[in-house]
C-alpha cells in the first residue's frame, strides 16, 4: 500500500508542473518520507532517515521536509518533538493535499499537520487518460482502504481508519486506462480486499469484491488479476467460485493465517480457527490444484508456547505454503496485544523465525523443482546481464532468461532449468510464440 501511495504522491506533484522528481536528496528542495507503522523497526527507520536529512537542512535551511504515511497518523506532533526541523506531517488520506501544504509551509514557516482520516479524495489523482506513466506491464490499483477487524496486534485501523471502498466504476475506468497504456497484469490493493463493498445508490445495487472481479475480468488486454491482502473471515464462497469462473485470476493466493495455533489466533482476535482456514484452502485447491498459497506469520506473539509454535510448523507443512512474510511480533501502541505479557525471549523468537523461514524455503525449493514449465509476463531487460530478460510467473517468482527484447510486455512460455539463490529462477524459452 505504501509503495502505491508513494506513486500517487509522485503523480500529484507531477500534475502541478512545479516539481521535477529526483531520488537524490542532496539536490532536492523538498524531501518527502512516506512511512509504515506495522512494525517498530520500520518506525525507527524514519528517525534514522530524518537524522541524515537534518544534515542537508543545516546546509540549506530552505529545504522542506514532509513526513507522511501511517507513522505520521500514529505519532502526529510527537515526530516533531524528536525532529524539530521537519515542516509538514500528513496522513495516507490527506496526501492529495500535499501541493497546498507545501505552498502553505513556505508562507507560514512553521509546522503544518494534516492527518484527517476516512477520505478517498486522493484517488482522484490516480491514472487517467492524461497521465504519463513509466513503461510498465504490471500495476497496482487500490480498491479500498482501512480495516474494521481490530486484530489485537494491528495498528492499521488506528492509522488508516475504518473500511472505505472506492466507486466500482472509477476502479474499472482506472484499469481500462492502464490497459490502454500497456499494462497486462493488475494487483488489487486494500488492507482487507474481501471486505470491498460499494453501494451504487443510483442503480440501487451493492457491489461486492467478487462482483468487482467479474467486471475486471471483462477488460481486454488485462490477462492477470491478483489481489492483496485478504482476510479469511470474509473469504466467502462467492470469491472461491470466482476462481472457477475467472481464468484471469492467477494461481497464487496470499491469505494470511498468522499462526497455526487456535489459542494464539483467539488472542490475536482473528475471528477464525485453523479448521476454517484449512477448509477455505481445500475448496480453492479443489478448483485450482496447482494454486500456490502464501501467508503471513507473526512469531513469538505473547503467550506463544513451544507447543503453539510446533502447531504452526505442522500447519505450514499441511497447507504446503511456499511463500511467506514472517516477522517477529512487534508491540504496537494502542493495540490490545500491547497490554499482554510478552513472555517469549528475543533469542527464542529469532530461533522460531529462522525455523519458519527454513521450512517455507524448503517447500518453495520443492515447488521450483516440480514446476518445469511456466507462462511468464516479460517485464524488461536484466540490470545485471543485458543479454537476459526477466519476467514473473503466475505465483510471482522472478525468472531470468535469454530472449529477444520484442517479448517485453508480452507473455511467453518458459522451461525452468535452474534455481538461483533459492529466490530467482533461470528459464529457457520453449517457443518463440508470444501473446
From Swiss-Prot:
It is found in: Cytoplasm. The keyword Methyltransferase does not apply. The keyword Transferase applies. Gene3D superfamilies: 3.30.750.200, 3.30.750.210, Methylthiotransferase, N-terminal domain (3.40.50.12160). Residues 367-431 form the TRAM domain. Its EC number is 2.8.4.3. GO terms for molecular function: 4 iron, 4 sulfur cluster binding; metal ion binding; N6-isopentenyladenosine methylthiotransferase activity. GO terms for cellular component: cytosol. Binds 1 [4Fe-4S] cluster, which is coordinated with 3 cysteines and an exchangeable S-adenosyl-L-methionine. Its main location: cytoplasm. Catalyzes the methylthiolation of N6-(dimethylallyl)adenosine (i(6)A), leading to the formation of 2-methylthio-N6-(dimethylallyl)adenosine (ms(2)i(6)A) at position 37 in tRNAs that read codons beginning with uridine. NCBIfam families: miaB-methiolase, MiaB/RimO family radical SAM methylthiotransferase. This is tRNA-2-methylthio-N(6)-dimethylallyladenosine synthase. It comes from Buchnera aphidicola subsp. Cinara cedri (strain Cc).
Amino acid at each position: 500500500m505504501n509503495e502505491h501511495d508513494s506513486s500517487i504522491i509522485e503523480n500529484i506533484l507531477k500534475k502541478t508542473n512545479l516539481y521535477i522528481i529526483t531520488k537524490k536528496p542532496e539536490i532536492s528542495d523538498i524531501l518527502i518520507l512516506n512511512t509504515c507503522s506495522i512494525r517498530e523497526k520500520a518506525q525507527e527507520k524514519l528517525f534514522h532517515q530524518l537524522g541524515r536529512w537534518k544534515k542537508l537542512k543545516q546546509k540549506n535551511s530552505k529545504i522542506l521536509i514532509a513526513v507522511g504515511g501511517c507513522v505520521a497518523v500514529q505519532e502526529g506532533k510527537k515526530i516533531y518533538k524528536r525532529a524539530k526541523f521537519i515542516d509538514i506531517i500528513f496522513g495516507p488520506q490527506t496526501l492529495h493535499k500535499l501541493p497546498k501544504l507545501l505552498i502553505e509551509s513556505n508562507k507560514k514557516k512553521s509546522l503544518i499537520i494534516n492527518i484527517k482520516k476516512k477520505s478517498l479524495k486522493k484517488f482522484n489523482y490516480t491514472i487517467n487518460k492524461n497521465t504519463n506513466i513509466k513503461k510498465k506491464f504490471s500495476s497496482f490499483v487500490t480498491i479500498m482502504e482501512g480495516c474494521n477487524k481490530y486484530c489485537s496486534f494491528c495498528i492499521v485501523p488506528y492509522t488508516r481508519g475504518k473500511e472505505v471502498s472506492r466507486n466500482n466504476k472509477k476502479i474499472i475506468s482506472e484499469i481500462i486506462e492502464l490497459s490502454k497504456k500497456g499494462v497486462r497484469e493488475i494487483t488489487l490493493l486494500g488492507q482487507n480486499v474481501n471486505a470491498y463493498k460499494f453501494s451504487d445508490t443510483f442503480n440501487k445495487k451493492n457491489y461486492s469484491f467478487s462482483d468487482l472481479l467479474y467486471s475486471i475480468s471483462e477488460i481486454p488486454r488485462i490477462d492477470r488479476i491478483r489481489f492483496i491482502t485478504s482476510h479469511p473471515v470474509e473469504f466467502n464462497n462467492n470469491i472461491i467460485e470466482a476462481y472457477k469462473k475467472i481464468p484471469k485470476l492467477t494461481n497464487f493466493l496470499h491469505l494470511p493465517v498468522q499462526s497455526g495455533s487456535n489459542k494464539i489466533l483467539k488472542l490475536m482476535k482473528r475471528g477464525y480457527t485453523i479448521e476454517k482456514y484449512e477448509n477455505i484452502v481445500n475448496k480453492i485447491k479443489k478448483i485450482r490444484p496447482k494454486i500456490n498459497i502464501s501467508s503471513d506469520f507473526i512469531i513469538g506473539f505473547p503467550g506463544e508456547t513451544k507447543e503453539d509454535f510446533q502447531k504452526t510448523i505442522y500447519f505450514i507443512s499441511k497447507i504446503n505454503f511456499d511463500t511467506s512474510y514472517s516477522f517477529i511480533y512487534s508491540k504496537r501502541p494502542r493495540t490490545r496485544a500491547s497490554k499482554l505479557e510478552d513472555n517469549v525471549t528475543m533469542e527464542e523468537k529469532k530461533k522460531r523465525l529462522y525455523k519458519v523461514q527454513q521450512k517455507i524455503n524448503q517447500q518453495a525449493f520443492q515447488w521450483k523443482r516440480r514446476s518445469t514449465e511456466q507462462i511468464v509476463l516479460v517485464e524488461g531487460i536484466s540490470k545485471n546481464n543485458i543479454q537476459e530478460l526477466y519476467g514473473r510467473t503466475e505465483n510471482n517468482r522472478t525468472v531470468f532468461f535469454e530472449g529477444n527484447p520484442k517479448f517485453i510486455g508480452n507473455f511467453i512460455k518458459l522451461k525452468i532449468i535452474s534455481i538461483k539463490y533459492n529466490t530467482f529462477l533461470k528459464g529457457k524459452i520453449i517457443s518463440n510464440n508470444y501473446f
